[in-house]
Amino acid sequence: TATVDCSDYPKPACLLEYMPLCGSDNKTYDNKCSFCNAVVDSNGTLSLSHFGKC
């Protein structure tokens, strides 16, 4: 199972790097930072489906 360490999030701003991740909500996130911020916002209900686009 793919995992991402989001322990040092949320961050106020994300870099514009493009390394897509697919969330359990079937949404493609541009990078780890935007994904982890969404994980924090979801109170831990969002998880990583896989690396790459959904």
From Swiss-Prot:
InterPro entries: Kazal-type_SerProtInhib, Kazal_dom, Kazal_dom_sf, Prot_inh_Kazal-m. SMART domains: KAZAL. GO terms for cellular component: extracellular region. Glycans are attached at residue 43. It is found in: Secreted. Disulfide bonds join 6-36, 14-33, 22-54. It comes from the Eukaryota. Residues 4-54 form the Kazal-like domain. The record marks 16-17 as: Reactive bond 3. Its main location: secreted. One of its GO terms (molecular function) is serine-type endopeptidase inhibitor activity. It holds the Pfam family Kazal_1. Keywords: Disulfide bond, Glycoprotein, Protease inhibitor, Repeat, Secreted, Serine protease inhibitor. Avian ovomucoid consists of three homologous, tandem Kazal family inhibitory domains. PANTHER family: SERINE PROTEASE INHIBITOR KAZAL-TYPE 7, SERINE PROTEASE INHIBITOR KAZAL-TYPE 7 SPINK7. This is Ovomucoid. It comes from Opisthocomus hoazin (Hoatzin).
